[in-house]
Amino acid sequence: MTATADKQLQRGIVQSLGLRHPKRIVMPVERPNLHYSVLPTAHVTDAILRALQKTPGKAVVFCRLRARTESLAERLNRAGIPAAAYHAGLNREERSRVVQAYLSGRIRVVTATSAFGMGVDIPDIRLILHDHLPTNMIDYVQQSGRAGRDGETAYALLLFSPADFLRFHTRCQQIRVQHKHRPFTQYALIQREWRPYRRVLRFCLQAPCLSQGISAAFGQQSAPCGNCSACRSGAIGKEIPNIPRMTVQELYCWILQLHRDELHRRNPHQKQATNAQLREIAETMQLPDNLPGRETYFPYLRAFQSHP
């Protein structure tokens, strides 16, 4: 039994267990009481603070790194929001203290890695935030689904910045270096990384309804929820005031800037050539379908091409 298994994972489970014609009971992943929003922003921490100020009750902020959980908890405490970090680097006693403080109301927010929630059932979490782009939809649905288990209205806000794309690009570059003499292996590994990541990008930027997008990721269908940021605005979420959201063109520009900085850090002699390439790309920014260098350097930008 699992709460989040798409069709591919279901096939894998059946194959691993050697089952023949098993009876499958699949329930809808749709959560009508959970309102989803996505927001690309250059000011992730500010957006987290504003979301917490706007939404009362218990909250969890999922972070990619342990160090980020610690620094963010410190930042929230300085802002007057009681918080504590939770990650696998803490011993069992320390993790238990955080959970007990959370349950008792001594802290309002847990900043956590994916380790939080395993074996912990807290029904009255009102807000789940992600300060990064998840690498696949299964992880996102598992983590965001920890909100509103009591059936009351709850919220899930996914924040992401171009630094997320740089991390993905860096991972692809590592694969290319590690398997430079095995192009077929290189291609297969990059595609394995890219496919689930692309689904998350399309969910964030192109889903007409985020709840529908989650259902579709699991091979299901649902009606528009009417409550998510896509249903309310027809575009990427705008509901947090005074946090400048990023347009798709700005995302392009920032990704390219980060890419140039990374190349220069590794080899300063490449800077001029990269600048020339960036100028050429910037001149055609209004024509993303014809973006020079996209196929060579930025294949992951393909997810943006049909977004207005």
Predicted regions: what is each one?
Residues 189:
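Anionic-ligand-binding alpha/beta catalytic cores of soluble enzymes and soluble regulatory domains
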Residues 120, 206, 269-273:
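Helix-turn-helix/winged-helix DNA-binding modules
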Residues 30, 121, 193-196, 210, ...:
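N-terminal alpha-helical segment
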Residues 1-184, 195, 220-223:
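Helicase motor core with emphasis on the C-terminal RecA-like subdomain
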Residues 166, 178-183, 193, 221-308:
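Accessory DNA-binding and partner-docking regions appended to nucleic-acid-acting proteins
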Residues 33, 124, 196-200, 213, ...:
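A general alpha-helix detector
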Residues 192-233:
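C-terminal accessory regions
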Residues 6, 41, 45, 193-197, ...:
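A structural signal for well-ordered alpha-helical scaffolds and beta->alpha junctions
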